[in-house]
Amino acid sequence: MDKDGSNIKNHFGILICGHGSRNKLAIEEFKDLTLSIKDRYKGIDVEYGFLEFAQPSLVDALDKFKKKGITKVLAVPAMLFAAGHVKNDIPSVLNSYSKKNNIEIVYGRELGINNLMVSAACERVKDVFTKNIEIKPSESVLVVVGRGSSDPDANSNVCKITRMIVEGLGMAWGETVYSGVTFPLVEPGLNHIVKLGYKNVIIFPYFLFSGVLVTRIKRQRDTVALKNPNLAFYDAKYLSSHPHVVDTFEERINEILYKKNNADMNCSLCKYRSNLFGFESEVGLTQVSHHDHVEGLGISCDLCVSECNGSCELEIQALGTQLDSGGKSGHHHNHHHHHSNYPNAMHPLGPVNLKAKEEDKS
């Protein structure tokens, strides 16, 4: 079997499965990433689709393959770690389409943690020191911001990324915070970190793309920075289309294409498969999607031209509309779909209690 698609009896296609965003820049960045992947698989049909809030949907992308007579699709989730979207929502769409249309869909792994992803992360943080030669890693604390989910395995993987960067660059200290769902959130985490005594704070959003969450992180950083004028805060760029990220996508595709290694996810710490302490009630739960009613919605936010400026959240707050929290996705667009109960939803530094404190102040 050749990488250019020759010597293949049944023509196949590659589907890059994205989450989706209402932010124009995030979608453009995703498209650029897909083009980089296409460049590595010339002669093979490569399409992309989104789970929600952007077009084309995953079904739209699969329809393109069907119209071309493609009978096998290699689907790879464009997500850093395996939480609900990777384990439940995307597979639900793919399985349903496969059964209805008699198309074989082989699902690959999330990007996960490998040397390539660690190197990409280290280089993003190293760029801060290259551009600011007056500061040193040994005098700086690193704050890695993960997305946050109700899946403890996905959350813990962000901590591993933090440690690998800290040791790789020789940082003075490292902390992990999250943008939503779990704890500690960005602002309370930073309020703790500024007490450690380091004069430089490097904030690295461990995200693939731009969007409202990255903007929210910057706004919360500004809030803490105003209260700590003696400290210097620096932003590391999120991953985007870093060459090593593209390399990892190629690795995941090739795991399926050439049946190299094991393309299955690591289930040893999956809360649905293993009796994880504190998550015993979720072992064996039926893994179902709750995105069917938002899939394919593609209304872009028109409050900002390109990069999210946070106007959407400010507008929602002005209207008194509650943002998602406590086991929900935390996006600026309300999902209104059910998530399983998260044991730590009521943590003092989690979204529910912090939201309540803010409302008490107002």
Task: Label every PLM stretch briefly.
Residues 1-362:
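Active-site-proximal alpha-helix that buttresses catalytic centers in soluble enzyme cores
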